[in-house]
């Protein structure tokens, strides 16, 4: 993975898991919203920074709950463009994650 892409994702996350909102530890993963098996690439819009547990270990994790994850934009179908697929943030806001590292807010969340 390109270090600049990984760094942009980490900067966007601002030290927090992008699914639960808690502070990140050193035990985190860069999750492909459009899975590699679905044609997903290493792009800023396609990657989110998450706790290892939120990624694939805990009962509430992305991979163990694909329907919830797809509804929240944490996982994206093969025909979808991650940069154009809404993503639900921990505060409830609904955003588009862009490849330049910016976030376009569609619906404001709780502050």
Give a label for each model feature:
Residues 72-111:
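Short flanking/linker segments adjacent to small metal-binding domains or redox-active Cys/His motifs
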Residues 36, 68-75:
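A short linear boundary/processing microfeature
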Residues 1-16, 41, 72, 84-87, ...:
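Short, charged surface segments at domain edges that flank catalytic/cofactor-binding sites
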Residues 12-23, 36:
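Short hydrophobic alpha-helical module
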Residues 1-5, 30-37:
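Short Cys/His-rich Zn2+-coordinating modules
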Residues 34-47:
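Short linker/helix segments within small regulatory modules
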Residues 18, 29-33, 50:
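Histidine-centered catalytic micro-motifs used for acid/base chemistry in nuclease
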Residues 22-25, 47-70:
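Short Cys/His-centered divalent metal-binding micro-motifs
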């Amino acid at each position: 993975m390109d270090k600049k892409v990984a760094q942009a994702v980490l900067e966007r996350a601002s030290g927090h898991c992008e699914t639960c909102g808690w502070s990140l530890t050193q035990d985190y993963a860069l999750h492909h919203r459009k899975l590699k098996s679905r044609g997903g690439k290493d792009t800023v819009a396609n990657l989110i920074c998450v706790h290892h547990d939120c990624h694939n270990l805990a009962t509430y994790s992305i991979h163990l709950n694909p329907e919830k994850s797809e509804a929240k934009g944490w996982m994206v179908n093969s025909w979808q463009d991650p940069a154009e697929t809404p993503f639900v943030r921990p505060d409830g806001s609904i955003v588009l994650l862009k490849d330049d590292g910016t976030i376009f807010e569609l619906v404001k969340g709780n502050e």
